[in-house]
Swiss-Prot record:
Keyword Nucleotidyltransferase: no
Organism from which the protein derives: Sinorhizobium fredii (strain NBRC 101917 / NGR234)
Compartments reported by the entry: Cell outer membrane
Signal peptide: 1-26
Classification via SUPFAM superfamilies: OMPA-like
Keywords assigned: Cell outer membrane, Membrane, Plasmid, Signal, Transmembrane, Transmembrane beta strand
Stored InterPro entries: OMP/PagP_b-brl (IPR011250), OMPW (IPR005618)
Name of this protein: Uncharacterized outer-membrane protein y4mB
Similarity-based family: Belongs to the OmpW/AlkL family.
UniProt cross-references to PROSITE patterns, sorted A to Z: PROKAR_LIPOPROTEIN
Domain of life: Bacteria
GO cellular component, one term: cell outer membrane
Topology versus the membrane: Peripheral membrane protein
């Protein structure tokens, strides 16, 4: 770096610091009075909030058939509508329940290389969230909680019978943000990681009874609309 470049960077940094200080001082002068510490939820707002999102379900392709070396499983990804309901205990602490249903086509992609079947999945997920409130309309949050994955309406491909995927309880992690357009409406982006590893079994015309593990561990990536009552 040349001496002139270094001088330019120092000047730029000094100007930036000055603007930041002036902006902070102006914010202090123009900020409304701080709400009393006893108020648990923003004044005038209900503790209830809903979101409607489009949700991409991106699975991790991993699994096995017991007793079959080199076996592996893959699962189809999907795009679904999703509803979530949140309740704010305070301005920062909330609980969120997501509701939606999806399906996965299951295929053995290792030693056998054949489609196994299809299973529908209802994965209600409850998370406890911390919402950051220091960034104006931009409201990021972090969450962690529990997922219960309920498999239903399972069907088999040719050669397979009696496919059964066990229901599963697992952990969930979450990060996202709302950008509020006004007091009630906003847009949302949300990412969740669901830890889902379960057991499955089925009968095959040639191979007989089969069983194994299905490690799905999906990413749930959603975007949509927020409404705070």
């Amino acid at each position: 770096m040349s001496r002139n470049d270094a001088r330019y960077l120092r000047c730029t940094a000094a100007l930036g610091a000055a603007f930041f200080a002036c902006g902070a001082a102006a914010a202090e002068l123009t900020s409304p009075p701080v709400a009393p510490a006893t108020e648990g939820v923003a004044a005038g707002l209900s503790p209830w909030q809903i979101r409607v999102r489009g949700l991409g379900v991106l699975t991790e392709d991993s699994g096995s058939i017991n007793g079959v070396p080199g076996s592996d499983l893959s699962y189809s990804d999907s795009l679904i509508p999703e509803l979530d309901i949140s309740y704010f205990f305070t301005d920062n602490i909330a609980a969120e329940l997501i509701l939606g249903t999806t399906y996965a086509n299951i295929k053995e992609v290792g030693a056998v290389g054949v489609p196994v079947g299809k299973a529908w999945l209802l994965p209600p997920t409850l998370t406890l969230q911390y919402h950051f409130t220091d960034f104006g309309a931009f409201k990021p949050y972090l969450g962690a909680g529990i997922n219960y994955s309920l498999f239903y309406n399972q069907s088999e491909k040719a050669g397979f019978h009696d496919l059964d995927v066990d229901n599963h309880v697992g952990a969930a992690l979450q990060v996202g943000f709302d950008y509020m357009v006004d007091e009630h409406w906003g847009v949302n982006f949300d990412v969740k990681k669901i830890f889902l590893e379960t057991e499955w079994k089925a009968d095959h015309d040639v191979l007989g009874p089969l069983s194994g593990k299905a490690k799905i561990d999906p990413w749930l990536i959603g975007a949509g609309v927020t409404y705070r009552f």
